[in-house]
Amino acid sequence: MVLASLFFKSTRDALHMLTKKLLSACLGAGLVAALAVSASAADITGAGSTFVYPVLSKWSADYNKQTGDKLNYQSIGSGGGIAQIKAATVDFGASDAPMKPEDLTTGGFGQFPLVVGGIVPVINVKGIKSGELKLTGKVLADIYLGNVTKWNDKAIADLNPGLKLPDSQIAVVHRSDGSGTSFNWTNYLSKVNEDWKSKVGEGTAVNWPVGIGGKGNEGVAAYVTRVKDSIGYVEYAYALQNKLPYVLIQNAAGQYPKPNAESFSAAAAGAEWTKAPDFYLIMTNAPGEKAWPVTATTWAIMYKEPKDAARSKAAFAFFKWALENGQKEASALDYVPLPETLVKQIEDYWTASFKG
């Protein structure tokens, strides 16, 4: 895609130089984000979701201190995680896009949720702070469709009376890799904008109408940090870590809740996990006045009959420890820990579904 079609000439050259500088960093994000430099034969290995990386990193460090066991995790995106577990090169894949039950059966996999969190739009617009800008899902989709191209467009201005909006081109940033974060983002946009649903749809990778791609949540955050007048979407912890202003989104009840553990929990409150085969459940655009509209889950995906039963048992020991003892760490990073009833359901699922 031609970058000149996305940005004013004044930003084109800068973005071209930025792309060169960030390319190697973004391509190496998975290696930088690994929880150990190299994996020994005894290490638990996993790959996938960048959404879950902040809490998985904390859990891994604490687990290593308590048990001496290590987790080597590559934060490469949900698509990469699914590809690696299918290739049996890791003990588990992590994805924010659940596999359908029929695909799990075909591949011999099982999956279970780990944590709940939120995906937030983030911006780099001079003078606008976190929570000051409000957008509906429809307008967000129109921005990503290329229908709304300036920050002072009437569609944005009408939602933000009194807020000074620049007469500048919107620089759209999206994911370049197979991404569960993108799956939930595009799933949400498909629910709130018919044009998006018919022209683009949902998926871990879609044909983006406009914008430039960053690899991982890390790459999107890096672009938004450096590109003036940009907008992107990241897991909430990345917004906090990079000090990126977030945008408020109108939810299904017509309210504009702040993104935090409370609003993510409100969205998750109505999730009926007991009715979800293999925990296949998507929480975007959930009902409730306090619900954050782009709330998501990360699933761990593992073989039901692994070739190496000892490594599989080690992975389950880590997940059991994390789900039963990692709530405090998850909450500190503004994720929502799974309720005890769901943890019990997950552990029963392990017993019933996995061998070895």
Give each language-model segment a name.
Residues 15, 35-41:
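Sec/Tat signal peptide C-region and signal peptidase I cleavage site
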Residues 7-26:
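Bacterial N-terminal signal peptides that target proteins for export
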Residues 21, 35, 94-95:
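Assembly/oligomerization scaffold segments
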Residues 26-34:
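Bacterial N-terminal signal peptides
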Residues 41-356:
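Flexible loop/hinge segments at secondary-structure junctions
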Residues 1-2, 17:
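Short hydrophobic transmembrane-like helices used for membrane targeting/insertion
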